[in-house]
Structures are given as structure tokens and as C-alpha cells.
């Protein structure tokens, strides 16, 4: 049941400005939400800062109630984006420097349990991993991290990585269409791509039966649903 999601108040939004100022929920007011994922305990939302030298944010909300718990201050000067949970760690895309940040789930649980409801600087507590493609969005499925690169016009690629022995190992590469902002897998392997570009053009949710179907014909999804502009990450 995701009915509570309509009540989540993300720090940095116009409706939360008073609380943000009083409780110091964010490092600056120029925040732009980008990614979302869920765990058994939390809803996690990323936001990058458009202010030079300011840090991005990872907001943590209680999954049962939607209550805001804490904000993790992330790396400076990064276009903080897609986010995924692999059961042990949370992975966050940093497209500007072509890295993924890994946050141990226990670290997030420890901060969330305190219910500080404020910004906590975590810039020195998180490890980075270089990847072979610019990470725009990410998801976890069947033991692998799938990292997709957004392009404006031409078809792009999505690379599957395995995390083993403290390293990310490239396993396979798939073709994807342009403008991909989010990716998610259903349990049966069906793939959902959120595609968008620009504030005045429609977004589209593109559905593929399998990875092989996506790779074979990236511009011909089995289903395409028109949506409002500016769709970003998608989660199931």
C-alpha cells in the first residue's frame, strides 16, 4: 500500500521551507529531487543541489507512515541522481564524475533510528566506485546492478555490474533508447523505462518483455504510456 506517498513532504520543496529553515533539514535551498527507491523500512529520495559547492541530499522517510527521519549530506559538486538498494547497500549515481556511491544499509538504519529530522554531513563516510558508463539511473535485479546512461537523441546503453570482493565488475551491456531517466524490473523480468527530456514535452513509460527484447529493438517497446513532462526514476 503506497497511499501514504501523497503525504511525503520532501525537504527543499516550497511547502517545507519553514521547517527546513528551523530544523536545518538541508544544506541549501536550491535542491532538485531526482531518484527514489524503497526498502523494507524506508522510502529513500535523492536530490542534487544547483548551488555551486553545495552538497546533494539523501532523504530518508519511514515506509509505514511517510514520516521524515533524516537527511544524509552527500558529495559536493555532483549531479546526484538514481538510487537503488541491493539488500545490503544503497547505491547512488553521480553522473558528473562517473561514479556510484555505496552506503551500507546499517549506516542509514543507525541514522534513521535516531529520528534526528535534520541534515547530517556524511560526505566523508561513503565510498565511491568508478563505472564504465555515465550513471544516470540505476536499479538492482537478480544479483546485478543495472546502470543506464541518458542521452538526448541517440540510442544509449545500460551496463550490468556485479559487486564482488569490494569491486564492481562489468558483466554485460544492453542497448537502450534515448532519454532514459529511470529503470525498473518486475519479478518476471519485464523492464520499465521512464523516458523524458524537457519541461514542455511528454514523458513516456516504455515496457519491454525482457532484456533481450530491449537490446534487440530498443526503440520498439511492447507498450508505451504517455505521461506528464519531467518523469525521472521509476520503482516497483
Predicted feature residues:
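Asp-box/WD-like beta-propeller blade repeats and closely related beta-sheet repeat scaffolds
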Residues: 111-141
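Structural motif
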Residues: 52-59, 98-107, 153-162, 200-209
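Repeated scaffold domains used in trafficking and secretory/extracellular systems
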Residues: 28-35, 77-84, 128-140, 177-185, ...
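Short coil/turn segments that connect the beta-strands within blades of beta-propeller domains
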Residues: 40-42, 87-88, 142-144, 188-190
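Conserved beta-strand positions in repeat-built beta-propeller and related beta-rich domains
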Residues: 38, 44-53, 92-97, 147-152, ...
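Beta-strand-rich domains and repeat architectures in extracellular enzymes and scaffolds
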Residues: 17-54
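A short beta-strand motif characteristic of beta-propeller blades
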Residues: 12-27, 67-73, 122-129, 167-174, ...
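Loop/turn-rich, solvent-exposed surfaces of beta-rich toroidal or solenoidal domains
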Residues: 173-213
Amino acid at each position: 500500500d503506497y497511499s501514504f506517498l501523497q503525504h511525503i513532504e520532501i525537504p527543499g520543496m516550497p511547502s517545507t521551507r519553514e521547517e527546513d529553515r528551523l530544523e536545518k533539514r538541508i544544506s541549501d535551498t536550491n535542491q532538485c529531487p531526482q531518484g527514489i527507491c524503497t526498502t523494507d523500512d524506508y522510502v529513500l529520495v535523492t536530490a542534487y543541489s544547483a548551488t555551486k559547492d553545495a552538497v546533494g541530499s539523501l532523504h530518508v522517510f519511514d515506509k509505514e507512515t511517510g514520516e521524515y527521519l533524516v537527511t544524509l549530506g552527500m558529495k559536493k559538486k555532483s549531479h546526484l541522481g538514481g538510487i537503488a538498494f541491493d539488500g545490503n547497500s544503497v547505491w547512488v549515481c553521480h553522473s558528473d564524475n562517473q561514479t556510484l556511491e555505496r552506503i551500507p544499509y546499517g549506516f542509514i538504519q543507525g541514522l534513521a533510528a535516531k529520528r534526528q529530522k535534520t541534515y547530517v554531513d556524511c560526505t566523508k563516510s561513503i565510498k565511491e566506485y568508478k563505472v564504465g558508463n555515465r550513471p544516470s539511473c540505476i536499479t538492482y535485479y537478480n544479483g546485478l546492478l543495472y546502470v543506464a546512461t541518458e542521452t538526448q537523441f541517440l540510442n544509449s546503453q545500460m551496463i550490468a555490474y556485479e559487486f564482488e570482493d569490494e569491486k564492481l565488475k562489468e558483466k554485460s551491456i544492453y542497448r537502450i533508447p534515448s532519454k532514459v531517466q529511470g529503470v525498473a524490473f518486475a519479478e518476471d523480468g519485464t523492464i520499465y523505462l521512464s523516458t523524458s527530456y524537457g519541461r514542455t514535452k511528454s514523458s513516456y513509460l516504455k515496457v519491454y518483455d525482457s532484456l533481450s527484447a530491449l537490446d534487440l529493438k530498443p526503440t520498439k517497446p511492447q507498450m508505451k504510456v504517455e505521461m506528464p513532462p519531467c518523469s525521472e526514476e521509476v520503482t516497483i
